[in-house]
């Protein structure tokens, strides 16, 4: 597998300075996210701090949605009964041959292939 993708909750923890998230990100040379994750993070930020958060996320390699990711997300949505935005996030990792790092075990079961749950809070 190639360098992983990070889910929204891991990045929120990282932005909040949680040591577990800082340690997890430090394990990897490249940090990749879906445009959906970027959007979810900005949506949770007050307007006054969004510019700063965009700068903090700038080093992350951003993956835009395309037809392959959309088709894979539709399959995941139907097969696994997953929320559509979560299906897009997982599909972005899978289409790019990577795992998804998350601590969201409610939407991404730990036993699901391609999921890494590094810690819980």
Regions found by a protein language model. Name each.
Residues 58-79:
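Acidic catalytic patch
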Residues 34, 38, 50-53, 70, ...:
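A general structural signal for well-ordered alpha-helical segments in protein cores
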Residues 10-11, 37, 69, 88-89, ...:
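Alpha-helix capping/helix-boundary segments
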């Amino acid at each position: 597998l190639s360098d992983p993708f990070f889910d929204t909750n891991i990045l929120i923890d990282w932005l909040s300075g949680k040591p577990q998230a800082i340690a997890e990100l430090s394990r990897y040379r490249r940090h990749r996210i879906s445009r959906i994750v970027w959007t979810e993070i900005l949506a949770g930020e007050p307007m006054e701090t969004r510019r700063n958060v965009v700068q903090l996320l700038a080093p992350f390699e951003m993956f835009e949605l395309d037809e392959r990711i959309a088709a894979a997300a539709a399959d995941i949505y139907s097969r696994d009964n997953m929320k559509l935005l979560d299906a897009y996030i997982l599909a972005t990792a899978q289409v790019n041959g990577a795992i998804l790092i998350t601590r969201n075990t409610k939407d991404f079961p730990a036993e699901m292939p391609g999921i890494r749950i590094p810690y819980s809070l």
